[in-house]
Amino acid sequence: MRVIVKGGVWRNTEDEILKAAISKYGKNQWARISSLLVRKTPKQCKARWYEWLDPSIKKVEWSKTEDEKLLHLAKLMPTQWRTIAPIVGRTATQCLERYQKLLDDAEARDNEELGLGAGEDESSKPATDARGLRPGEIDTDPETRPARPDPIDMDDDEKEMLSEARARLANTQGKKAKRKARERQLEEARRLAFLQKKRELKAAGINLRAKPKKKGMDYNADIPFEKQPAPGFYDVTEEQAKVHAAPVGSTLRALEGKRKQELDEIEERKKRQKKGDGKSNQTQQFVAAREAQIKKLKEQEQIIRRRKLNLPIPQVGERELEDIVKIGQAGELARELVGDGNKATEGLLGEYEALGQAKMARTPRTAPQQDNVMAEARNLRNMMAAQTPLLGEENTPLHGPSVGTGFEGATPRHDVAATPNPLATSARGGVLTSTRTVPGVGTTPLRTPFRDDLNINDDASVYGETPMNDRRRLAESRRALKAGFAALPKPENNFELAETEEDEEEAEEAEPLTEEDAAERDARLKAAREEEERRELERRSTVIKKGLPRPVNVNTYKLLDDLNSAIVEQTDEEMAAAFKLVNLEVAMLMKHDSIAHPLPGTSTPGGLASEYDMPEDDFVAEAKNAIHTELANALGLPGASDEHLRLAIGAAAEENEAAFAEAWAEEREGLVYSPSTRTWVDKTSLSPEELSACYAAMINASRDRVIAEATKAAKAEKKLGKQLGGYQTLNEKAKKAIVDVMEEIHQTKRDMETFLMLKGIEEAAAPARLEKIREEVAVLKKRERDLQARYAELNDRRRENLAAIEQLEEDKIVLAAQVALEAQEGEVADGDVDMNGA
């Protein structure tokens, strides 16, 4: 007995049978499909379809992008090839084989670098391809290999398998479909036989008994919902009288016509004939079209493999180019003037040709790109060869954290290689670097040393060698350093622990503490940030908190002089010194607010750090408590809360408001505004001329204020007119509609009153009018009866006269007949007399 071991290399015939079987049975009945293939199991058939024959499988060469994605996903999800395959767009077997090949290439590259690859031979290379199998080896995964060509002489088993598959696959209908088709053919034959019998009997003069008419409509004889067409303009009697000749002498097959199956066979025969006639021409055209298509696909593949061109953004705009041209023209003019003069002055001006170096300028070469595929393959190979981490050895050496695809996401990291910018590259062989520490601010590129023929500046100069520029650069560095220190967070807790030997021994013996949960750590850090933000908001001044008006620009020295000049002469020097300290603190706080919270229109440069030393929160709290206690004692409310103090101060202010207003009015009457000093002065201290000038200035100021207010009001009115114009139009329309509705209501009321009045008049006059009409109707009825009687009498007389006329006509006819008869008898008698006489 011959034993057949299923499996092995797939052949072309088996692939074709498998594809035909899948097209018939689908991709779920693998047991039925495998019954057509003698040497294959259902599992092998399924693997063959999903690993090789499926049209969606990519069999082209792997690209660099796919290799990077494969290695990156293998690093994130090791050995999960079923998950990686749909992301890469390949099958799991293809991904695994490509992964092993990349690792083998990385190993070979490392061996070449270490000088270990000289003694290798062909037998030591891995067999990654089915065609590279050594003698005696068996391919463990033949479902992923190309099919082997069919042999010229097939075995009997293969021929039997092929014939059986051809027979089974040709039968596209099942048993039930066959039975239904056979029943339809029998029904059609029965119907045709009955029709032929009926026609033959009718031709012989024998009519079959008609079936009893069913109730309802016979849809075979009648037309449901039939509507006769309307008669037209033309005579159609000839068409209706046309007699159709009976099909005498015609066979039933000719009357029935050709069936659909016969028509399909004729059409298929024509197609085969046409295909056979133009087979040679089509073959030549197909070969040419196929070559053109292959060429087009190769061109597209080359285009896809090209690196994307990334050009740098333009460093010089149109306006700057025009300025550069003007500067170059100015230099040329200066050179011509010097050249026309004395030879002694020619050495004072260097040769600064605008396009001198631009003629030989070349775009710097793009930096070499790292091979991410090889780097990732080496890293993965090193990780696979590493020992278990429980041994405590060093970590696996990787090829740099910046090289590779990274761990940022599911897709590999790509470094875009842009064309270098020649303007950002130093002409002396180095790349421009900035010495500033403020982020986002760069130094001016080396402009003067590019064309320094007189060697005024050295190679490393940026701003020049003037002392002013050096001091400016030093001050800027200090300011940036201070800003960096100011941005550092303040320490929350300061602890100093002196650990003894006993503590060290206990720490070694104690168990390690558990690691803090990430969610708890994030919540703690968030609470700390919110607390720090709240403290920063509380450190703001009251003016900033309440949004009170404040000056845009603050001159600390002038403000301090004005505040100190307002201090009343104090007998106590300590109080005067205290007032000065308070004024100094106020001036510094106002300057800090203008820098930290600038207003629109300020002249303070942005990014400037305030020099105000913010007091500690504890000191501020103690000062507020002291002020609160002193204010409560002054108001006679010791121990009162802030709310009670606020109410007490408000009540005291309301009591003194009237007195203050009266005192201010009296004081205001004795003051005038002096335009010369721009202050309010006493009237008694001015001469009449100065007083009139002050009044004139006040009148002009009032007039200007009135004009400004009028202008503002006009602008507001215009703005409101634009905003409310639509609403005004709608209001006018609504008002007009309301007026129209009211007029309609009034008109309706008038009509109703008129009709009510008419109703009353009609109700009063209707009875008399009805009585009169009834009398007229009675008269008309009586007259009609009389006329009807007269008509009946005359009608009877007419009938009598007609009867008399008919009787007279009959008598007349009878009389005429008698006369004619007598005349005829007389003629006969005369004839007899004549004959007797003769």
From Swiss-Prot:
Superkingdom of this protein's organism: Eukaryota
Residue runs in coiled coils: 250-311, 727-813
Domain called HTH myb-type: residue spans: 2-57, 58-107
Record's compositionally biased regions (Basic and acidic residues): 131-151, 255-278, 520-539
UniProt cross-references to InterPro entries, sorted A to Z: CDC5L/Cef1, Cdc5p/Cef1_C, Homeodomain-like_sf, Myb_dom, SANT/Myb, SANT_CDC5L_II
Annotated stretches, region: Disordered: 114-155, 253-285, 433-452, 490-539
GO BP annotation list: mRNA cis splicing, via spliceosome; mRNA splicing, via spliceosome
Residue range(s) of DNA binding per entry: 30-53, 81-103
Key words, A-Z: Coiled coil, Cytoplasm, DNA-binding, mRNA processing, mRNA splicing, Nucleus, Repeat, Spliceosome
PANTHER family found in the cross-reference section: CELL DIVISION CYCLE 5-LIKE PROTEIN
Function: Involved in pre-mRNA splicing and cell cycle control.
Name of this protein: Pre-mRNA-splicing factor CEF1
